[in-house]
Amino acid sequence: MAVLTMKQLLEAGVHFGHRTQRWNPKMKEYIFGARKGIYIIDLQKTSKLLDEAYNFVRDKAAEGGTILFVGTKKQAQQVIKQEAERCGAFYVNHRWLGGLLTNFETIRKRIDKLIELEEMEANGEFDHLPKKEQSRLRRILEKLRKNLGGLKNMTSLPDVIYIVDPRKERNAVYEANLLKIPTVAIVDTNCDPDEIDYIIPGNDDAIRAIQLITSKIADAYLEGREGVSFGSEEAEENNQKEDNEEIFEIEDVDESEEM
């Protein structure tokens, strides 16, 4: 049983890596070849490693563990928010605040401030304040919502962190590794796979690829929490035998959008 079929991975453009001038040699074993100056990721390995990541997240959730979704690049922001909210996970989709994990007690105080200001706004307390003070508090509230809105219910450190583009989210990766919090991540051809516990080799720039993989991580978390199977789709019989040369025949994805 495979979480995703080869066809789904191909159609989402998961196989498109970065240009050959931009790569990390540690990703060599996950690269099938190159096409028109673009690295092509080996989707057989992506499929296998995605299955492992799915099972890990599902099992952690079944044990009562929590997960934090992280993706602050433009292509990931909306997907991270939607999928995290769908499965009841925490998320950061705008800016990773330094010390979010390593100095969580201080961050938690800022989250409490966010909750306090939201309650004041909901109760109409802002309306009784001078306009200048109203404006100041609303600015603070907006900033806190943007940076910490996805963490309001996070009262302790998460048990797993899911990351889109660990190269961009290097601070999140550093803090997670320092605290020995397991990480799951979409790892493109320019990333260092050694920094991540459960890697998913794939395109971390295309919205469709990010959506496809992130939705499966969310499904895994839901399955573990609620005990409801989302049905790992059985790969087509020829998925195992499928020749990766088919990758080179896919023409319906605009590579310029993926890089």
Swiss-Prot record:
User: Mind telling me which CDD domains this protein's record contains?
Assistant: RPS2 (cd01425)
InterPro entries membership: Ribosomal_uS2 (IPR001865), Ribosomal_uS2_bac/mit/plastid (IPR005706), Ribosomal_uS2_CS (IPR018130), Ribosomal_uS2_flav_dom_sf (IPR023591)
Region named Disordered:
228-259
Q: Name one GO cellular component term.
A: cytosolic small ribosomal subunit
Name a single GO biological process: translation
Q: Where in the sequence does UniProt note compositional bias of the Acidic residues kind?
A: 233-259
Recorded superkingdom? Bacteria
Q: Which GO terms describe its molecular function?
A: structural constituent of ribosome
Q: Which family does it belong to?
A: Belongs to the universal ribosomal protein uS2 family.
Protein name per UniProt: Small ribosomal subunit protein uS2
Per the UniProt record, the source organism is: Thermosipho africanus (strain TCF52B)
The gene designation is rpsB
